[in-house]
Curated annotation (Swiss-Prot):
The keyword Magnesium applies. It catalyses: (2R)-2,3-dihydroxy-3-methylbutanoate + NADP(+) = (2S)-2-acetolactate + NADPH + H(+); (2R,3R)-2,3-dihydroxy-3-methylpentanoate + NADP(+) = (S)-2-ethyl-2-hydroxy-3-oxobutanoate + NADPH + H(+). Binds 2 magnesium ions per subunit. The gene is ilvC. It comes from Aliivibrio fischeri (strain ATCC 700601 / ES114). Mg(2+) 1 binds at residues 217, 221. The lineage of its organism: Bacteria, Pseudomonadati, Pseudomonadota, Gammaproteobacteria, Vibrionales. This is Ketol-acid reductoisomerase (NADP(+)). It comes from the Bacteria.
Length: 494
């Protein structure tokens, strides 16, 4: 197999990267009806597999789980997840031949083996579904020409897919049809019905492509969504401890600060997040974020370049073939960082205190969101895709840090995201430590400005506000958030 994206000519690459259209609610008028009366078989029963299946069943679809015989015989967690929720569970050989739609929701590194195993069992004219297109785009999986290949990619962890559905809402979702596999022209009907079955149509669906989903998803998770949270947590904790701030307070400010700060981001973009600061703090955060953007732009661009070229995938798949030696080593190193081991504290931190004493975190979020967005759009990815993979998902990932620090983040995200996170953080951490943090004081991380006056120069404040509000991520964000007015509140601090 060879990288599918690299087999396309430049015009085809740009066309696929630029596929992104916000779909009208009317396009989902029939909701999941196209799949009713048909057999949906999910392979894999982890967070996405279980929660998508629960939603689809509640939407009136016939859902079952195909697991490896060993997983059934040994009653592994995937078997328990499906069985305890009342689903039909059986082997590949039993269920796959019955399926009209087979949905592969196993981890990325298992996709080639899973698809090669199930494809011979699939009946003529069936459909194969993915929630991430890595196997198709980066590994170049060749799929039988009689099979329709579709993607439904919820833009959040599986647990949120279920919780939002139970509220009568959903999560924003990318849907796509593989242009090489739509023999009957029914791909979009299948994808729309699957998305509606999960509830995604209520929050808004983007008509995308396998290529656009993969390239933007990899970029977001490696940089702002995971890598920046990891690097920022490590260097900020080190700075506070070195400058005499109590470890329990320092750790808690970071662990829950990311979540609280990005909650504001979720509802009103970078503009609202920055508006939560006093005027002097906003100006300071803006100045810091400008420094960070200048320092880190080459690193963001390198990650985008390596994703587009396929170099990232080649490197990661080489580690897969080497039993994940690098992944496991980096995971162990992360577990040994000072932030991961800070002592629990019952110190109370108010919501506003996370902003007042976490000015640096606000600066890092603004810089990271804008850098990721700019790198993606400069590479041909449309604004809508870039927004979802930079700003929109950030509160959801920050929520995992709040639960169990970086460990939880790296457990919840995919192995692909975790590997990319370490690649970024392993460079970003020493870069920040050596080139940025020496000039940072605890007035922006740990203690706050403590200003006696809220006075700032009017011209300076106007210029800062204009720069924040007129960034392209703010324009597209305002439009897309208008479709998600029923978003629930995630956090107000720990």
């Amino acid at each position: 197999m060879s990288n599918y994206f690299n087999t396309l000519n430049l015009r085809e690459q740009l066309d696929q990267l630029g596929r992104c259209r916000f779909m009208d609610r009317e396009e989902f008028a029939t909701e999941a009806d196209y799949l009713k009366g048909k057999k949906v078989v999910i392979v894999g029963c982890g967070a996405q597999g279980l929660n998508q299946g629960l939603n689809m069943r509640d939407s009136g679809l016939d859902v079952a789980y195909a697991l490896r015989q060993a997983a059934i015989d040994e009653q592994r967690q995937s078997y328990k997840n499906a069985k305890e929720n009342g689903f039909e569970v059986a082997s590949y050989e039993t269920l796959i031949p019955q399926a009209d739609l087979v949905i592969n929701l196993t981890p990325d590194k298992q996709h080639t083996n899973v698809v090669e195993t199930v494809m011979p069992l699939m009946k003529e004219g069936a459909a194969l579904g993915y929630s991430h297109g890595f196997n198709v785009v980066e590994e170049g999986m060749q799929i039988r020409k009689d099979l329709t290949v579709v993607m439904v990619a919820p833009k959040c962890p599986g647990t949120e897919v279920r919780e939002e559905y139970k509220r009568g809402f959903g999560v924003p979702t990318l849907i796509a049809v593989h242009p090489e596999n739509d023999p009957k022209g029914e791909g979009w009907d299948i994808a729309k019905a699957w998305a509606a079955g999960t509830g995604g149509h209520r929050a808004g669906c983007l008509e995308s492509s396998f290529v656009a989903e993969v390239k933007s998803d990899l970029m977001g998770e490696q940089t702002i969504l995971c890598g920046m949270l990891q690097a920022g947590s490590i260097v900020s904790y080190e700075k506070m401890i070195a400058d005499g701030i109590e470890p329990g307070y320092a750790g808690k400010l970071l662990q829950y600060g990311w979540e609280t700060i990005t909650e504001a981001l979720k509802f009103g973009g970078v503009t609202h997040m920055m508006d939560r600061l006093s005027n002097p703090a906003k100006v300071k955060a803006f100045e810091l974020s400008e420094e960070l953007k200048e320092l880190m732009r080459p690193l963001y661009n390198k990650h985008m370049d390596d994703i587009i070229s396929g170099e990232f995938s080649r490197t990661m798949m080489a580690d897969w073939a080497n039993d994940d030696v690098n992944l496991f080593g980096w995971r162990e190193e992360t577990g040994q960082t000072a932030f991961e081991n800070y002592p629990e504290s019952d110190v109370e931190i108010s919501e506003q205190e996370y902003f007042d004493n976490g000015i640096l975190l606000v600066a890092m979020v603004r810089a990271g969101v804008e850098l990721a967005f700019e790198a993606m759009t400069a590479s041909g990815i449309i604004d809508e895709s870039a927004y979802y993979e930079s700003l929109h998902e950030l509160p959801l990932i920050a929520n995992t840090v709040a639960r169990k620090r970086l460990y939880e983040m790296n457990v919840v995200i995919s192995d692909t995201a975790e590997y990319g996170n370490y690649l970024f953080a392993n460079v970003a951490t020493p870069l920040l430590r050596e080139k940025f943090m020496p000039s940072v004081e605890t007035d922006v991380i740990g203690r706050g400005l403590g200003e006696a006056s809220n006075q700032v120069d009017n011209a300076t404040l106007i210029a800062v506000n204009d720069a924040i509000r007129n960034h392209p991520v703010e324009y597209i964000g305002e439009e897309l958030r208008s479709y998600m007015s029923d978003m629930k509140r995630i956090a107000v601090g720990g």
